[in-house]
């Protein structure tokens, strides 16, 4: 049955014969690797079942439930502070700027005293199998590793 047009003239209707060539999939999905307060899928923070496992999250609230919050800052009388762990702030800013889903790989907690590039490499290897991840973000690498170790990551 033909369509009823309101004005006279020539109308062209294109009928697609091929399926859509570009898939509708989200792009720019980041994979964050760094240190978290804890890594647990339930309220028992002693169990680290999410440690070194890529977890897909969709909000800051989900992140806080699985990985905790930012570390407490310790200010000195001079006004200096030592803030090595910036993953939480990076995630917070990601969602403050309209971020959607992302993947998190926790490679340890805030009690770490020594940092090795291998921990970050292990986290990156966990993200290799996830096709959705198109951006790699390692904010803690810049603050925890020595400059000479950054090149190896």
Give, region by region, the residue ranges found by the protein language model.
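Surface-exposed assembly/interface segments
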Residues: 1-153
């Amino acid at each position: 049955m033909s369509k009823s047009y309101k004005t006279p003239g020539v109308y062209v209707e294109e009928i697609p014969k091929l399926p859509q060539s570009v898939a509708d999939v989200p792009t720019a999905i980041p994979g964050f690797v760094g240190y978290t307060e804890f890594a647990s899928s339930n309220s028992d923070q002693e169990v680290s079942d999410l440690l070194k496992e890529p977890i897909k999250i969709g909000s800051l609230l989900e992140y806080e439930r699985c990985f905790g919050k930012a570390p407490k800052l310790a200010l000195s009388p001079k006004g200096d502070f030592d803030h090595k762990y910036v993953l939480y702030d990076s995630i917070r800013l990601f969602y403050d700027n309209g971020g959607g889903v992302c993947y998190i790989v926790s490679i340890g907690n805030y009690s770490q005293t020594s940092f090795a590039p291998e921990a970050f490499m292990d986290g990156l290897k966990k993200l290799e199998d996830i096709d959705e991840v198109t951006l790699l973000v390692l904010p803690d690498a810049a603050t925890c590793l020595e400059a000479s170790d950054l090149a190896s990551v």
